[in-house]
Regions:
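Phosphate/diphosphate ligand-binding glycine-rich loop within oxidoreductases
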Residues: 2-107, 201-203, 209, 213-216, ...
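Glycine-rich adenosine-cofactor-binding loop
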Residues: 10, 92-97, 104, 109, ...
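NAD(P)-binding Rossmann-fold cofactor-contacting core
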Residues: 134-152, 289-296
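Rossmann-like adenosine-cofactor binding region
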Residues: 150-218, 337-343
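Adenosine-phosphate binding glycine-rich loop
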Residues: 197-258, 398
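NTP-dependent small-molecule kinase module
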Residues: 246-255, 276, 280, 386-414
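ATP-dependent small-molecule kinase phosphotransfer cores
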Residues: 290-348
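A glycine- and Lys/Arg-enriched "phosphate-lid" helix/loop adjacent to the NTP-binding pocket
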Residues: 349-387, 391-394
């Protein structure tokens, strides 16, 4: 390979957005370079057939001794995530430090005088700990599965009632294993803030649980963009307007990549609105009920009649888990999707959830097993209203022309 190669190395890169981000920042072509083994990573650096690369899990610590010169901050942290080839000599940097500092600042997080719990002991742990330490944290605790080398176990960490800030540096909850969580945030009475360096999905289970409790919480997407902008400065040797670029690229990419999920009572028009909205947004439209029928080979009324509602909800939960892991979709959900607690978080992990509202007397009820109209429909609405409210990020009135409803949805998504 020529020394014009720019890209990302790591063991598994199927989750990466780095190519999209870097090609918005600068005019080089950025290549994803999965290297499954340490031997392959060492050989890659030894050949030096690249211009500049970013380094991700699990090679940030391995990369450091492969460099001829290492930036003092990266050396102090013990991890390198940016390597630039200048005339055959490799220069190592750590832009994760500035990226995480940007994330914290963007969400008003002040580490001064705080007790911080960092989950995980890998390369990113050292980076996060350095930012917290430099920010004046009173105490920095570490938790891991094993509790070795001075770390707490996750069970011990949950008993530390003085923890005020939690930062996850592990891959737990990352695509495709979304929905996983290492810590019960409800066990920490003084907890104020949760930051998660995982960026895919946009909101991990840990972040969603924190938001449910009214805490300041954010995933790692802004950190990803920030460290990429700072890395691009090393790649190109030119200063960039990072204060403008980082929020601009973060907004643009999240809007492009995010799902839009529609929930609401059966017959409120989710599928009709969703198909039209997807066309306007240039996203793929998916009807969750149709996907259930495709997978089971049965019509939904037949599933209810032959197997019961509990079986249907299991099929539905599997479909929702799969669909919401993906990106660039408009997803129309069945009316009862919010009855399953796991679904309510899954729906929110990769974008906004719009609650489509329509007067009960205008709901279509034909062919809907649990929605027959009259008193039963009113009782269903009463039961589900708080669940829709808890799951939704915005409400969308669908009581007029389709074009007006779609226009209102586009306004909500600005």
């Amino acid at each position: 390979m020529a020394q014009t190669l720019y890209g990302l190395i790591g063991a598994k890169l199927g989750h990466s957005y780095s190519k999209i981000i870097h090609e918005k920042i600068a005019d080089y072509t950025y290549t994803l370079l999965p290297l499954p083994t340490e031997a392959e990573a060492r050989a890659f650096f030894a050949k030096r057939e690249f211009a500049a690369v970013n380094v991700t899990i699990p090679y940030k610590q391995l990369a450091l001794p492969c460099c001829d010169e290492v930036d003092p901050r990266a050396k102090a942290i013990g991890a390198v995530n940016t390597v630039v080839n200048r005339g055959g000599r490799l220069y190592g940097y750590n832009t994760d430090y500035a990226g995480f500092a940007y994330l914290a600042k963007a969400h008003g997080v002040d580490f001064a005088g705080k007790t911080v719990l960092v989950l995980g002991t890998g390369g990113t742990h050292a980076t996060v700990s350095a930012v917290c330490r430099d920010g004046g944290a009173k105490e920095i605790l570490t938790a891991s599965r094993t509790g070795r080398d001075g770390a707490l176990t996750y069970e011990q960490a949950a008993a530390r009632s003085d923890v005020q800030i939690v930062v996850n540096t592990t891959p737990c909850g990352m695509y495709p294993e979304t929905g996983q969580c290492l810590l019960d945030v409800a066990a920490l009475p003084q907890l104020e803030t949760v930051l998660d360096v995982v960026y895919n999905p946009f909101a991990t289970e840990l972040v969603l649980r924190a938001k449910d409790r009214g805490l300041t919480a954010a995933g790692g997407f802004e950190m990803l963009v920030a460290q990429a902008v700072y890395a691009a400065e090393h790649f190109t040797g030119k200063p960039l307007d990072s204060e403008t670029l980082i929020p601009q690229i973060s907004r643009e990419l999240q809007k492009d990549l995010q799902n839009v999920v529609l929930i609401g009572m059966p017959g409120c028009g989710k599928s009709t609105v969703g198909a039209a909205l997807a066309k306007k947004l240039g996203k793929t439209f998916v009807d969750a009920d149709e996907e259930i029928e495709r997978r089971t080979g049965k019509a939904i009324p037949d599933i209810f009649a032959q197997e019961g509602e509990a079986a249907f909800r299991r099929y539905e939960a599997d479909v929702i888990a799969d669909l919401t892991r993906q990106n660039r979709q408009v997803i129309a959900c069945g009316g009862g999707v919010v009855k399953t607690p796991e679904n309510r978080h899954a729906l929110r992990q990769n974008g906004p959830v719009l609650w489509v509202q329509r007067p009960l007397d205008k709901l279509a009820t034909a062919g809907r097993p649990l929605s027959k109209g009259g008193a039963a429909l009113r009782e269903m609405a009463h039961e589900r209203l708080p669940l829709y409210r808890a799951a939704a990020t915005a409400t969308l009135c669908n009581d007029g022309a389709l074009a007006d409803t779609v226009a209102a949805a586009l306004h909500l998504l600005k």
